[in-house]
Amino acid sequence: MRKCIFILLVILAVSYRLEAKKQEVVMPSGKEIYIPKDLQGMDLQNPDSKWSYHRMAYTDNFVIFWEKGFGNDLSNPPQLEVDLLNLTEKLESFYHFFRDTLKFSKPGSKCDKYRMMVMLNYSLEGTAYGGDYDGEIGALWIAPNRVQDKKLNCIAHELGHSFQAQISCDGEGEAWGGCGFFEMTSQWMLWQVNPEWITDEKYHWDAFMKLTHKAYLHLENIYHSPYVLEYWGMKRGLPFIAELYRQGKRGEDPVITYKRMAGLDQKQFCDEMFDAYRHFINWDFPRVWKETRPYANKYTTSLTTLSDGWYGIAPDNCPENYGFNAIPLALPERGKKVKVEFCGEAGKEGYNAIHTDKADWRYGFVAITEDGKSIYGDVSDNSGKSIIFTAPKVNNLTHLWLVVMGAPTEHWMNPNPEEKDAQWPYRIKVTGSKPL
């Protein structure tokens, strides 16, 4: 009897091992699946584990795990539905663009060896964020409420962070610590794969319209304004942005890195930033020309009326370092001249007076013709020169703008959030037109 029981137990044990072996998930061919340190103590072959190969999907470049609460079928979980097909298709599309066009990874990257990782948390309380696992491979941690948008704008943004982190994983770039440029770049990367981003997340554009005067890289604007990066990419090639990350050094901010890579001195950098802002008036970017038509020529600026026909910039939208105002002017008749006299007032009472010995400005006209073309007028600084714009004799104008930018003669890093930014007040006098 005991012998029979022993044999039966042996048979059951062997059967269990065979059944367990049969349930083991075979690893996919192609790129490896990296096992992060915090998962190495977990039995990923066990369906009852929090993370398991039994709740895994993969593409050529990604492995996607979802928590036990979803069950085996993401399209029909107990509560939280995820469109796995759309997620995998969008991930692959974003991946190829970020890698092959923007060049955020290069041949020899660790993402040539490993699939990037996506961890789906079973929660409605969570959000999404991108980064890396163990300094080895880019990763995403997401909750189902962030993958309901069919365009997956949030995922494109966060995958941007994964690719930014991949540069560090690959041993390149000391970068800039917690600089808000990372968020600005992810918004730009999202805009690259979705030209309709401004419309889809119009609240960012609405906010930027009220914050154009803020210093470049100011934390209030980092989610709202990827537009300088669009200009840089147009001017120097899309891969230049990823190269900024590779070339960034400790003790620098993105402006210092950019100037060094582009070979620009401070005056040249200010000239270039002003040119970028002139492009913002009519959104003169060929890649998104069609999509930005509803947003062209929409700026307002708060001025105070002074004596003798002068107008001063109000403190609440006075330009900071590389911040700008776009002042709408009344249209002149064909062939008529508009003259602007400009006077910088660094250190004026009621404004933040910081490094006033470094004060300078850029100002110039931007006119828009009835066929949608931009005319960029001459640019001046605070040398006391007046600027003149002559309206075309042939084409009618639909808009005329005076653009003014704070252009310090020396660059310094943005202050901490609790500290004040330098302001560059000014006044203008307009002849042949008037501010609207």
Language model features: what each stretch is:
Residues 38-47, 118-123, 376-382:
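Short, solvent-exposed secondary-structure boundary motifs
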Residues 252-436:
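Beta/coil-rich, acidic/histidine-enriched accessory regions frequently appended to metallopeptidases
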Residues 71-88, 238-248, 255-261, 419-424:
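A signal for specific C-terminal beta-sheet/loop modules enriched in small/flexible residues
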